[in-house]
């Protein structure tokens, strides 16, 4: 709005402006009196202002554990045909004082959820016990039998010697409205550094952007600090119910009242969540 106002005033003062390309130009200082009439049109168009440098995405390698690598960088990979364990999580509690306040949701949260501290201890425990993350899609492959019917085939995994494979999955990654007041984060966002962060409000109502309060960002951070926990780049499988959108973005149409304003907001939310999904997929998360 400021740029439009400045251009309008400049035109009234008969200041000659030269535009170049579609990149926004720095606004010239306001001129008054005779100074404006003496302004000369520049011989050449001004250089476009440089766009802010976008953060460089950290390289992230995703590979398959079904390939026999032998020994790489001193790590020997051996076949694993045993049980592949699975840990399943609901959204984790960022603020226990809001979750366990005695309201109607408190008991259910206590039964089904874990807190940030408990989640961190679980990650450290499975890491210390020699587990490594694998993608469920690498454990099984879809095929067809002699009758043309789809069947699932168990794959042989090749994992670092002495390690055990583990699958993580997460349910209800929608950030439902009813949970927001009960101590959970509100949504996932893409930070200026190109990484995934969580957004929410603390018990005092202050906005908080963090990587220490949400299951997704905590695991991302843990893997960055312990890359051997995910030798193939896998993180976890995110399950969406389709109710109230995805990842905290209200992309849904399941509402009793609908109008053009709601549809415009829904489309805006759809566009906003796309880069979040792309970055999650790029860094080892599946849906």
Spell out what each predicted region is.
Residues 1-6, 21:
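Positively charged n-region of N-terminal signal peptides that target proteins for export
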Residues 5-14:
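Sec-dependent, cleavable N-terminal signal peptides
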Residues 6, 27, 33, 49, ...:
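Generic hydrophobic/packing signal
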Residues 16-19:
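C-terminal motif of bacterial Sec signal peptides marking the signal peptidase cleavage site
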Residues 21-28:
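Bacterial lipoprotein signal-peptidase II cleavage site
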Residues 33, 37-85, 96:
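N-terminal low-complexity, Pro/Thr/Ser-rich intrinsically disordered segments
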Residues 79-286:
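Active-site beta->alpha N-cap acidic-glycine motif
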